[in-house]
UniProtKB/Swiss-Prot annotation:
Signal peptide: 1-26
Tissue localization of expression: Expressed by the venom gland.
Record-given protein name: U-scoloptoxin(16)-Er8a
Chief site of localization: secreted
Family designation: Belongs to the scoloptoxin-16 family.
Locations listed in the record: Secreted
Keyword set, alphabetical order: Disulfide bond, Secreted, Signal, Toxin
Entry-linked Pfam families: SVWC
Processing and modification events after translation: Contains 4 disulfide bonds.
GO CC terms: extracellular region
Keyword hit for Calcium: no
GO molecular function, one term: toxin activity
Length: 111
């Protein structure tokens, strides 16, 4: 494994471990509340989403849901991939696609 690849894997592991603190089987979080825009979420991607509507961020492998906040606001609830412990001898695969199909997984030689 090249030193660049080792550094990339090390950075990924640090990110994954820090994400593990959130929730071990994937995580949900509410992100910044937005002002009410006709009862819809405005994620600044050019689209408005009704409360209960889901959309996807394929680049970061997230599922985002527009939820009702408090005091006349809406919020974006984000679902992300579970975090895996490091498996020596295995390769971490990033399959791409839309959540949850884009979630990384380990491919081990003897499994």
């Amino acid at each position: 494994m090249t030193s660049t690849r080792k550094l990339s894997v090390s950075c990924l592991i640090v990110f994954m471990v820090s994400s593990l603190i959130a929730v071990s089987s994937g995580w949900l979080s509410s992100t910044g509340k937005s002002p009410l825009k006709i009862g819809k979420c405005d994620p600044k991607n050019g689209n408005l989403y009704a409360i209960g509507r889901k959309w996807y961020n394929d680049e970061d492998c997230f599922e985002i849901t527009c939820i009702q906040g408090d005091k006349g606001s809406v919020a974006q609830q984000v679902a992300s991939c579970p975090v895996h412990a490091v498996k020596p001898g295995c390769e971490l695969v990033f399959p791409g696609g839309t959540y949850p199909k884009c979630c990384p997984y380990y491919e081990c030689p003897n499994s």
